[in-house]
From Swiss-Prot:
S-adenosyl-L-methionine binds at P23, R24, Q25, H64, Q65, R92, V127, D128, G129, T130. Changing D194A: Inhibits tRNA m(6)t(6)A37 formation. It comes from the Bacteria. Changing K136A: Inhibits tRNA m(6)t(6)A37 formation. Gene3D superfamilies: YaeB-like. GO terms for molecular function: tRNA (L-threonylcarbamoyladenosine(37)-C2) methyltransferase activity; tRNA binding. It holds the Pfam family TrmO_N. Changing R92A: Inhibits tRNA m(6)t(6)A37 formation. It catalyses: N(6)-L-threonylcarbamoyladenosine(37) in tRNA + S-adenosyl-L-methionine = N(6)-methyl,N(6)-L-threonylcarbamoyladenosine(37) in tRNA + S-adenosyl-L-homocysteine + H(+). This is tRNA (adenine(37)-N6)-methyltransferase. Keywords: Methyltransferase, RNA-binding, S-adenosyl-L-methionine, Transferase, tRNA processing. It comes from Escherichia coli (strain K12). Homodimer.
Length: 235
């Protein structure tokens, strides 16, 4: 059996500082912006010449936060409620024989300086610090297949949860938006996807959660109406 070795070509800088609450697929949180920083010796302007003409990219990356858990022949996809099992190759699970992921993201800008190449990205679904092993331009004529079928994931999951903010948090956000544009929308879109594990959905009102987004510990509680963000704590 052959084995292969690959070099890391870059690293992701993202508002998702932990894997909890990262969308399960790209494109679900449109306001999630980040950057891909190429590293030496790949941080050359020539390496990305012409890339600015493409609107979207495929990013191939390593599931670096789960790779120590090894692979599993069957997994429980969240889209099936976390109960039914499927073969790992019939899912996008992180627990794979080779911990490689792929993400389709929006390319907003290519920024080249003397010693750096930075790709500005949108609709990101990758945790901060994710190692990148390759990037490829998205080709609509070859990769957009409207007649394709996709079993249990034929359509995007609905944004299930209504998200509200306490008056105090709304006041904080008004000030923070000057430094973090679209922060309110970003938090709302992330939480609307209901990042809780499938087995915890339906929990009683009052249960609290927290997630690290940008430079803040975002704390919210379950209410009868959905989720209420009650604290933004600087980290």
């Amino acid at each position: 059996m052959s084995s292969f070795q690959f070099e890391q070509i870059g690293v992701i800088r993202s508002p998702y500082k932990e894997k909890f609450a990262v969308p399960r697929q790209p494109g679900l949180v449109k306001s999630a912006n980040g950057e891909l920083h190429l590293i030496a010796p790949y941080n050359q302007a020539d390496a990305v010449r012409g890339l600015e003409a493409f609107s979207h990219l495929w990013i191939l990356f390593v599931f670096h936060q789960t790779m120590e858990g090894g692979w599993r022949p069957t997994v429980r996809p969240p889209r099936l409620g976390g109960n039914a099992r499927m073969g790992v190759f019939a899912t996008r699970s992180t627990f794979r024989p080779n911990p490689i992921g792929m993400s389709l993201v929006e390319l907003k800008e290519v920024v080249c300086h003397k010693d750096s190449v930075i790709l500005k990205l949108g609709s990101l679904d990758l945790v901060d610090g994710t190692p990148v092993v390759d990037i490829k331009p998205y080709l609509p004529f070859a990769e957009s297949l409207p007649d394709a079928s996709a079993s249990y994931a034929q359509s995007a999951p609905a944004a299930e949860m209504a998200v509200s903010f306490t008056a105090e948090v709304e006041k904080q956000l008004l000030t923070l938006e000057k430094r973090y544009p679209q922060l309110t929308l970003f938090i709302r879109e992330v939480l609307a996807q209901d990042p809780r594990p499938a087995y915890r959905k339906g929990e009683e009102t009052g249960k609290t959660y927290a997630v690290w987004l940008h430079d803040f510990n975002v704390r919210w509680r379950v209410t009868d109406a959905g989720f209420e963000v009650f604290a933004l704590e600087p980290r």
